[in-house]
Design a protein with these regions (language model features):
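Auxiliary Fe-S-binding modules of radical SAM enzymes
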Residues: 103-192
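Conserved strand-turn element in the central/C-terminal portion of the radical SAM core barrel
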Residues: 57-59, 65-68, 81-101, 124-127, ...
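Active-site glycine- and acidic-residue-rich loops that bind
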Residues: 26-33, 97-106
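Short, well-ordered secondary-structure micro-motifs
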Residues: 36, 62-64, 102-103, 132-134
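Hydrophobic faces of well-ordered beta-strands that scaffold small-molecule active sites
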Residues: 23, 48-52, 89-93, 120-122
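Alpha-helix N-cap and loop-to-helix initiation/capping positions
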Residues: 4-7, 66-74, 100, 104, ...
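Conserved Radical SAM active-site core
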Residues: 1-51, 55-63, 72-79, 84
Length: 192
């Protein structure tokens, strides 16, 4: 709400545009389309890209997980609007939550590509110490029947822990399930 009112990002973009300085924006918000008049000319010069994070296509789950963020369909509309304006868009499937959202990986990539995304990435759920308990509480409230399965799958993909800080593994995980997720991602991207 404060960005909508104060336009801080827009004022920064105005300065960057005036000086032909490159910018990459990562967002879950549809508000980024407000600044098309700045981003499109910058993109035409190769100076602007936008990454839009899509966690799930399930509107109900999205509301429970990210109550203040744009709904999945709105994010896909945002990708379409940005792409139509000539802005290179990356879809970021993030976070991928084993046994909760991982089955949607291909569908998200396909829908985002259809909307105009030209790049894609994914990030396996990361639970640093300060988030581990919070996520556990969220699961107890919203998915109590799946809590242990989700946490166990995450541990399998993180070498027995819920979080791994090691560079190269913290975003993707390790082990057979993590390799399978990466292969599914690569195969879907190749087919698009």
């Amino acid at each position: 709400q404060s960005e909508r009112r104060m336009k801080i990002t827009r004022s920064i973009l105005e300065v960057l545009a005036a000086h032909d300085h490159p910018v990459s924006i990562v967002t879950k918000s549809a508000l980024v389309t407000r600044d098309l008049d700045l981003l499109a000319p910058m993109a035409a010069k190769g100076l602007a890209t936008v990454g839009v994070s899509v966690t799930t296509l399930d509107a109900e789950l999205a509301t429970a997980m990210e109550p203040r963020a744009a709904r999945p369909e709105r994010r896909l509309e945002t990708i379409k609007t940005l792409a139509a304006a000539g802005i290179p868009v990356t879809v970021m499937v993030a976070p991928v939550i084993p046994a909760l959202t991982d089955h949607e990986l291909e569908a998200i990539l396909i829908r985002a590509r259809q909307a105009g995304a030209v790049h894609a990435s994914y990030i396996l759920l990361r639970l640093p110490l300060e988030l581990k308990d919070l996520f556990g509480e969220w699961l107890t409230t919203h998915r109590p029947d799946r809590k242990q399965r989700i946490l166990n799958r995450l541990r399998e993909m993180r070498g027995g822990e819920l979080y791994e800080s090691r560079f190269g593994a913290r975003m993707r995980g390790r082990g057979n399930d993590a390799k399978l997720l990466e292969e599914r991602f690569r195969m879907t991207c190749r087919q698009q």
